Every structure is written in C-alpha cells, then in structure tokens.
Amino acid sequence: MNLLVFNLKMLIIEGVIRLMQKYRVVSLFSGAGGMDLGFIQAGFEVVWANDVFSEAVMTYKNNIGNHIVQGDITQIPSNEIPDEIDVVIGGFPCQGFSIANSKRSTEDERNFLYREMLRVIADKKPKFFVAENVKGILSLGGGKVFEMIKEDFRKLGYKVDARILNAAEYGVPQARERVIILGNLFGVDNPYPKKTHYIPSNSPQKLDLFSDESVENLQPAITTEEAIGYLSDVRLSHSPIKVNNKIIYNHIASENVADKFWGRKYEVNQHDICDYLKEWRAKAGWSTKRIDEHFGYKHTAGHWFRKDNNSGSIPKPEDWWELKKILGFDDKYDKEVTTLIEKEIKFEQSLRITNWDRPSDTITATGPEIHVNKKRRLSVRECAILQTFPDEHVFYGSLNRMYTQVGNAVPVRLAKLIAEEIKSSLDINS
C-alpha cells in the first residue's frame, strides 16, 4: 500500500512539474514579434529569436525581451542557438524559388533563407515546427516548389500538413489569408485551430459553403469599424495619447495621399523587363546579391529579377540608369521605363479604401490601406490593432519601417490559437 501511495505521489509531482514547465521555442525571421507574442500568450517560452533588420529588433527587444539576436541567419551557426527546443517558428521568405526540370534553380541566392530554416530544424529537432507564408507560394512553379518544400521537411522525419487560414475566421478583424505549414515528430495529425468566427455572405470573403464546420456556434467576423472605429476622430500624434481610459501609442500615419502622382507615361510589361534585365545581368556576370550590395538595398534589388505579381517590380528611373551603367544594356526600354507624367489618382481603383462594415483587407508592408473617411493611410496603431497586437506594443523606427513591421507580422490572436493547439498536443504526446 505504501508503495502504491508513493507511486501515486510521484505521478502527481511529475504532473505538476510538467504543468509548471514551459515549452521552449526558437523563432526565426521574427520581425516585430507577432507570432512570438501569440506563443508567449499561450504559455510558451521563446528562448531565442532572430531578425536581420535593426528597427524590428529594437521593437522586439523593447516589447518582448533581449533574447532576440540581430544578424544574418546564414552567418549564425547552429551551436549558437539553444538546444532542447520544443518548437521552431517562423515565416521564411519564399522569394528565390524557381523550377527548372523539376529541380531547384541555384541562380537566385534568396532561396538560402529557406534552407536556413530547414537547417535549424534539422539540427535542433523540435517536436513541432510552424512556418507561415503567403498564398502565392502554393502556385510557384505550378505547385512543384511547394511540394518540394513539404518533402524536405518530411525527409527530416516530420508529418507535414499545410492549410490556408483566413485570420478573420479566428477572431482577427482582417481577411488575411496565409499558408500555415505544421510539422510534428510524433506522427499525429497536426492540430490546426477550429474556426471561431464566420464571414457574413455580403462580404467578398464569403463563408466556405463546402466546409465541414458548422456556423451555429461561430460569431460574426469582427469588422474594421468594431476594431478601430473609436480612433477615427482622434488626432494623429507622435506622443502617447489617452483614449477610452487606455494609452495609445504610434497613432501616426502617412498623410501623403495626393490626388495626383508621377507615373509612367507608357505601359510596361514587367515580365518582359524582368527577362531583359536577367539576360543583361548574365552577360555582365553580376549576381543578384552583388547588385543588392551595389545599391545598398538588402533584399530589394532582387525584385527587379522576379516575375511574381506580388513581389516583382520595375526599377525607378534613377535605378534604371544606374543599372544601365553596371550591366551595359541597350536602349530598348529606356523610354518606356523612365518617361514619367503627372496622373490623377482614382481612389477606388488605385488605393484600397478601408471598408468599415467587414473585416479589413490584408494589412501589408507596403500597400496603403486608406481610411474610409480620412484622407490618410491607416495609422500604424490602427494597422497594429487589425493585426491584434496589444495596445502597449510600441513600434520603433521610421514611419515606413513601422508599417513594414506591422504588415509583415503574423496576427497575434491567430498565432495564439495555433500555439494553444500545439501545446495541447505536446501535453498529450511528450
């Protein structure tokens, strides 16, 4: 009997210790810490994080902790990253992937960032990993790139699944669709969170009629007005302000929303320009990385050599002339690319006006979301609220850098719901 009591006590003690212990997380491409905050709110401990951009690191340190390391992940060896990790999280950049005869092209140096996440997972062997990415990753190379990505994770021993989650269906006031890849070493079903909200049928982002989830117990999606309407008539301020008995930070916005802008006089096909520049880059023997370094645009110049509709771009006139100097290309597209004229903005077509009575459109790093009744961009704080950052989460850096940090983040609430499901699975299977 005494032995039975002793064993029972030991089981209870082990259970209490397990409850007190926090699962350990390593975060890659952490940015301002949206996904990290969600995991922390769910009871995890983020023991190490990394980002290359100084402003994002400053925001992270001042709000979450000093465990973030600023630097290029390719230059950080695995032995400098903590061991005994339960979960690795991050949104690896998807630029740099291409398909040639069903094999990866090594021409573009940006795909190394994907390999770095794979490296950390291979070396640390976390029980779970979470990778977030844009929907466009599914169609790269006709879908072959994404299948290769999943297969790489499977080769490490993980059961891998991927789903498109719309944040608005999880209590985020924003119709943000992202691919969430989950992997686990237990071989169990990956634990995606259940929907908590539904998007009414009068919204462009309709309820999925083929979903097996009933809407009876779901709440209506949170509208933009419900989330940020109380700030509509609050004057922009660089200083903290008190609104509804709480302190609001970063209620600052770009007011450079003019009726006219300088745009290209002639239509230019971005795909043709991309092929043209890649041909001359090859002739000149310049890598994308070398061009990045020449311009000082870390991970920016590469946009000129991509056809992705979401991330490919045509150089500005001043950049075009500089490219011409270093690559030595002919005059074929000079006129089309560099001739600018003043154009009128058609707000309903050229800028996204915030719709008040439904979840916001996707908050992005660069695309301006224009306030429904103010001639300005949504403020940094309004965007942060739509990303479900806490009111006390303060962003640092220039105005554009703050917008970038908010737009690149994973919504905190969505991350928390994902983390809670992973925690439950860890509790059962560890």
Residue ranges and their predicted role:
Residues 21-125, 135-147:
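Core alpha/beta nucleotide-donor-binding catalytic domains of modification enzymes
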Residues 112-184:
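Conserved Class I SAM-dependent methyltransferase catalytic core
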Residues 172-243:
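Flexible, glycine-/basic-rich loop-and-beta segments that form/coincide
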Residues 247-430:
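C-terminal target-recognition/interaction regions appended to catalytic cores
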